[in-house]
Swiss-Prot record:
It comes from Bos taurus (Bovine). It is found in: Nucleus; Chromosome. GO terms for molecular function: DNA binding; protein heterodimerization activity; structural constituent of chromatin. The modification Symmetric dimethylarginine is found at residue 9. The modification Phosphotyrosine is found at residue 42. This is Histone H3.3C. The modification 5-glutamyl dopamine is found at residue 6. Keywords: Acetylation, ADP-ribosylation, Chromosome, Citrullination, DNA-binding, Hydroxylation, Methylation, Nucleosome core, Nucleus, Phosphoprotein, Ubl conjugation. The modification N6-glutaryllysine is found at residues 15, 19, 24, 28, 57, 80, 116. SUPFAM superfamilies: Histone-fold.
Length: 136
C-alpha cells in the first residue's frame, strides 16, 4: 500500500475521557472541598497585641458587671448577712478593682521582661507584690 499525504483537519472534540487509575484515586486521602479556601489564621501573638492596643485605647470596664456584683455580694456575706449595695458603690468597687489589677499586671509584665521572658508567670505576680510591699 502506498503512502498518502496527511492533510490537516479540524479537531472534533479531542480524546474521550479515560477512567481514573485506582492508584491515583487512592493517593487522595481526603476528598477535595470543592475549591474551599482554608480560613486565614494570624501568627501567634498578633491578635493578642491587637487586643492589648484596643483595650489600652478604651475606658470601658473589662469585667462584666453582673459576675462582679455576685462576687462582691459573696465576699460581703462573710462579714455581714443581708447587706445592701447602691449601684454606684458596686461601680466604684469595680473601677478600683480593675485599676488595681491593670497596674499589677503592668508591674508583672515588667518583672517577666526583666527575667528575659515574654510569658507572665505566677512568680512574676508574687515578685511585683513583694516589691510593692503588699506581701512580705
Amino acid at each position: 500500500m502506498a503512502r498518502t499525504k496527511q492533510t490537516a483537519r479540524k479537531s472534533t472534540g479531542g480524546k474521550a475521557p479515560r477512567k481514573q487509575l485506582v492508584t491515583k484515586a487512592a493517593r487522595k486521602s481526603a476528598p477535595s472541598t470543592g475549591g474551599m479556601k482554608k480560613p486565614h489564621r494570624y501568627r501567634p501573638g498578633t491578635v493578642a497585641l491587637r487586643e492589648i492596643r484596643r483595650h489600652q485605647k478604651s475606658t470601658e470596664l473589662l469585667i462584666r458587671k453582673l459576675p462582679f456584683q455576685r462576687l462582691v455580694r459573696e465576699i460581703a456575706q462573710d462579714f455581714k448577712t443581708d447587706l445592701r449595695f447602691q449601684s454606684a458603690a458596686i461601680g466604684a468597687l469595680q473601677e478600683a478593682s480593675e485599676a488595681y489589677l491593670v497596674g499589677l499586671f503592668e508591674d508583672t509584665n515588667l518583672c517577666a521582661i526583666h527575667a528575659k521572658r515574654v510569658t507572665v508567670m505566677p512568680r512574676d505576680i508574687q515578685l511585683a507584690r513583694r516589691i510593692r510591699g503588699e506581701r512580705a
